[in-house]
């Protein structure tokens, strides 16, 4: 392996900007409707399907090329945490959590994973709508215990483990960024991809029907297709930079060894 590539701090940022530039090039060349169909079909588009192997590869890679140091117990716990988050990301990508919740309480949750309007209500009497993965769903007395337990488990397994990992590595990450550690910069690009996904997901609703983001008579606008492409591609980039950080860390720790 070329040390000038894998061991340089700027490897991940260069790759991040190259991927975003390629995405904008694809957006500029494709019709908005065709781009949306290629990137987003509720887990069944070609791009969404292509994203799954990247997340799936995280699990075997983190055990095969363990990126962590320390005792065997520490390495096992950290590898297990990474595996759990990767598996939960696959669950989210395939919308399996929505399917499971619909199966648990079909009277409250529709097949699309959204709350059925007019069934559950807020304390002020207004209908409870949107995703069931929020506090108001958990505190509603009409929701079955099994559904509440599933939502709590989902948050604990995904966001809980992920948040614990962020807190555990927060200080080493900040130090690594300022010391130009390549793994820290790969993790930073991982986080930047996550921010990209969240911004692209919420941007249309933030801007509402202004700035050309409303649906036109012809269908999807160019701005809407860009947001869709950024969101879906950002999810693939999350997996790519997770894989890069894992391999970089393993390689740097074992450089010079016969591995």
Regions found by a protein language model. Give the residues of each.
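Short aromatic-rich membrane-water interface segments that cap or initiate transmembrane helices
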Residues: 41-49, 111-153, 220-233
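Alpha-helical transmembrane segments of multi-pass integral membrane proteins
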Residues: 74, 78-88, 176-205
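Alpha-helical transmembrane segments of multi-pass membrane proteins
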Residues: 16-34, 198-201
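N-terminal membrane topogenic signal
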Residues: 1-19
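Membrane-interface helix-boundary motifs at transmembrane edges
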Residues: 3-6, 64-78, 171-182
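Transmembrane alpha-helix/helix-exit interface in multi-pass inner-membrane proteins
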Residues: 89-107
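Hydrophobic cores of alpha-helical transmembrane segments in multi-pass inner/ER membrane proteins
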Residues: 50-64, 152-166, 233-249
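C-terminal transmembrane-bundle signature of multipass membrane proteins
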Residues: 194-259
């Amino acid at each position: 392996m070329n040390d000038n590539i894998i061991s340089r701090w700027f490897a991940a940022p260069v790759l991040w900007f190259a991927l975003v530039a390629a995405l904008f090039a694809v957006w500029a060349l494709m019709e908005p409707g065709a781009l949306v169909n290629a990137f987003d079909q509720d887990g069944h588009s070609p791009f969404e399907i292509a994203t799954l192997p990247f997340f799936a590869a995280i699990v075997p890679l983190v055990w095969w090329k363990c990126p962590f140091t320390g005792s065997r117990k520490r390495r096992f716990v950290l590898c297990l945490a990474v595996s759990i988050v990767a598996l939960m990301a696959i669950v989210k990508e395939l919308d399996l959590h929505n399917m499971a919740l619909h199966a648990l309480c079909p009277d409250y949750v529709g097949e699309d994973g959204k709350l059925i309007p007019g069934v559950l209500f807020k304390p002020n009497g207004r209908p409870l709508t949107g995703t069931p993965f929020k506090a108001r769903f958990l505190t509603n007395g009409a929701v079955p215990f099994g559904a509440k337990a599933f939502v709590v488990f989902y948050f604990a397994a995904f966001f809980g483990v992920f948040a614990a990992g962020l807190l555990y590595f927060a200080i080493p990450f900040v130090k690594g960024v300022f010391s130009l550690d390549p793994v820290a910069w790969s993790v930073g690009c991982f986080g930047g991809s996550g921010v990209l996904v969240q911004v692209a997901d919420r941007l249309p609703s933030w801007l509402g029907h202004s700035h050309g983001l409303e649906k036109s008579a012809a269908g999807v606008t160019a701005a809407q297709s860009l947001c869709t492409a950024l969101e879906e591609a950002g999810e693939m980039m999350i997996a790519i930079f997770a894989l890069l950080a894992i391999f970089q860390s393993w390689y740097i720790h074992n450089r010079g060894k016969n591995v």
